[in-house]
Amino acid sequence: MKLTLKRDLPLMLAVLLAIWCMWYARPVGVDTLFPGLEPDSIYVTLIDFTGSSHEDRNLVLTAGTPEFDALWADIQELQFRRSPLNVVVQAFPFLENLSSSSKTMEDGDITHMFLDLYQVNGLPSSRTEQLRFWVDAWEYRDFDHGVNLPLVMKNAKDIGQSMAHDLWDQAEN
């Protein structure tokens, strides 16, 4: 069987692209999203919208405390899938806001949770990474490209709301 460049190259490229998409969309954790991150502190911001008002709560956890260790362990256990289209959004950041979505809130849902992960020790300058949860969906901030990229996981709402409610009880107004 003789390979012809005109006929077989597009097929080989399509197969390689399909393999790459499957690899990129595999389950990953924060160790893949934020390689080498060893945070010194985690800043938690929770926002709960009820009607036309909202309540904000904040929590700062520092490394070496039991609360920090528990939250960092929970964050490290999270497994997400990334959309291969994230790479397109990284290359063309203006595409980030082209789609809009609305969220259906249920009674007791916490609207937003921001997990800011800060690392200062051992680095020439500080490093910040961010995971976000909005009602039922996760995303992470790609500071290098200035975009928020979606993450998918099984039971995303249940896991996010449970984590948000646990942190809500620890946080201050």
Indicate where each model-derived feature is located.
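Function-determining sites in protein domains
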Residues: 4-173
